[in-house]
UniProtKB/Swiss-Prot annotation:
GO terms for molecular function: rRNA binding; structural constituent of ribosome; tRNA binding. GO terms for biological process: regulation of translation; translation. The keyword Electron transport does not apply. PANTHER family: 54S RIBOSOMAL PROTEIN L1, MITOCHONDRIAL, LARGE RIBOSOMAL SUBUNIT PROTEIN UL1M. Belongs to the universal ribosomal protein uL1 family. Binds directly to 23S rRNA. The L1 stalk is quite mobile in the ribosome, and is involved in E site tRNA release. Protein L1 is also a translational repressor protein, it controls the translation of the L11 operon by binding to its mRNA. PROSITE patterns: RIBOSOMAL_L1. Part of the 50S ribosomal subunit. GO terms for cellular component: cytosolic large ribosomal subunit. Keywords: Repressor, Ribonucleoprotein, Ribosomal protein, RNA-binding, rRNA-binding, Translation regulation, tRNA-binding. This is Large ribosomal subunit protein uL1. It comes from Hamiltonella defensa subsp. Acyrthosiphon pisum (strain 5AT). It holds the Pfam family Ribosomal_L1. The keyword Repressor applies.
């Protein structure tokens, strides 16, 4: 058996995998254990009481975190006319139609989010095989196909996260960076949980939010005490 790294030994010593942590204690411990040479993200996994095999129980959407994610986001926008001007004014890095599509076909993918106005989908639709596998295809369900281009760009720049359950009914996303103050991480988590509650499928039965775990990019997961989350859930 290979030896554990010093970092992993410390994590194993300090993390009780059977314990449900109070939220404040969890953030404090995550900060203590975040010793990577880069600023780690704080990630969350939310187990939902849904049947992911049923299309009407899948959960997908987007929400703006009040304190952002700590990442700078580059936005590409497919639109034209007045919306193109609005996109530029809102801070989009790339704005265009066929010219932007040509850049993408040539492998120029220097962006994190793609937004499109409805009239531009005739162009964007031809890029499905490129954008789809990368999770970049615009979709009205997460607000990236919209007539309100300026708002969509502003939201993306402000720290909007997109979420979608996996085949096990779990939402994986980020709520900020480990150097955020604990209260900012908590408020970001509150925003996510509130959005997930609003997105609850009508056909989902029983306990909806079953478990919440927090971790950093290189750290172990901490299970959160549900009673500590009563105000959120």
């Amino acid at each position: 058996m290979s030896k554990l790294s010093k970092r992993m030994r410390v994590i194993r010593e300090k993390v009780d995998t059977a314990k449900q942590y109070d939220l404040d204690d969890a953030f404090l411990l995550l900060k203590k254990l975040a010793t990577a040479k880069f600023t780690e993200s704080v990630d969350v996994a939310v187990n939902l009481g849904i049947d992911a095999r049923k299309s009407d129980q899948n959960v997908r959407g987007a929400t703006v975190l009040p304190h952002g994610t700590g990442r700078s986001v580059r936005v590409a926008v497919f639109t034209q006319g007045a919306n193109a001007e609005a996109a530029n004014n809102a801070g989009a890095e790339l704005v265009g139609m066929d010219d932007l599509a040509a850049q993408i076909r040539n492998g120029e993918m220097n962006f994190d989010v793609v937004i499109a106005s409805p009239d531009a989908m005739r162009v964007v639709g031809q890029l499905g095989q490129i954008l789809g596998p990368r999770g970049l295809m615009p979709n009205p369900k997460v607000g990236t196909v919209t007539p309100n281009i300026a708002e969509a760009v502003t939201n993306a720049k402000a720290g909007q996260i997109r979420y979608r359950n996996d085949k096990n009914g779990i939402i994986h996303t980020t709520i900020g960076k480990i150097d955020f103050d604990a209260h900012k991480l908590k408020e970001n988590l509150e925003a996510l949980i509130s959005a997930l509650k609003k997105a609850k499928p009508a056909t989902a039965k029983g306990l909806y939010i079953k478990k919440i775990s927090l971790s950093t990019t290189m750290g172990a997961g901490l299970m959160i005490d549900q009673s500590a989350l009563s105000s959120l859930v």
